[in-house]
A protein has these predicted regions:
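Helix-turn-helix-type domain boundary/helix-start signal
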Residues: 28-29, 36, 61, 88
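Context-gated lysine
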Residues: 9-11, 26, 39, 53, ...
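Glycine-rich flavin
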Residues: 44, 49-126
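Mature N-terminal segment immediately following signal peptide/propeptide cleavage
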Residues: 29-50
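A ubiquitous short alpha-helical element
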Residues: 7-9, 34-40, 105-107
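Intrinsic disorder at enzyme termini
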Residues: 1-34
Length: 126
């Protein structure tokens, strides 16, 4: 059924002009300043560093292990680990935002980020 069908009147159709398809629940409005900064840093890394290497790797059917060193230098690995142990001491919302930005470019690298941060680094810290 569509909005042009007889079951819907024009006045009853939702206004999708104001709908934000990238943030339908407007969750970005709930983020704290430090979470926004971490998200923006991760997005910048994903666009400027990760994307070109993913495109190049896809063409050559290769994985670029150097990306992990670069993620580490950016502080994207183990961000929930306290600063005194080498992490950023960020919350899990920030961790999710970083994962979302990396996932936006490539799910394989996001999986590797998650394994390194959650299954390797966190158990060593804990």
């Amino acid at each position: 059924m569509n909005f042009e069908s007889a079951s819907y009147k024009t006045k009853d159709a939702p206004d999708l002009n104001d709908f934000d398809w990238l943030d339908p629940f407007k969750l970005s409005d709930l983020l704290e300043e430090h979470e926004v900064l971490i998200k923006e840093s991760a997005a910048s890394f994903a666009n400027d560093v990760l994307m070109p290497k993913v495109v190049e790797g896809f063409a050559g059917e290769e994985v670029c292990p150097e990306i992990f060193s670069e993620m580490g230098k950016m502080g994207l690995l183990g961000i929930t680990i306290p600063e005194q142990y080498g992490g950023l001491g960020a919350n899990y919302v920030s961790y999710g935002l970083v994962a979302q930005e990396i996932e936006r470019i490539d799910s394989g690298y996001r999986s590797m980020l998650s394994v390194q941060s959650s299954l390797v680094m966190y158990p060593i810290y804990a």
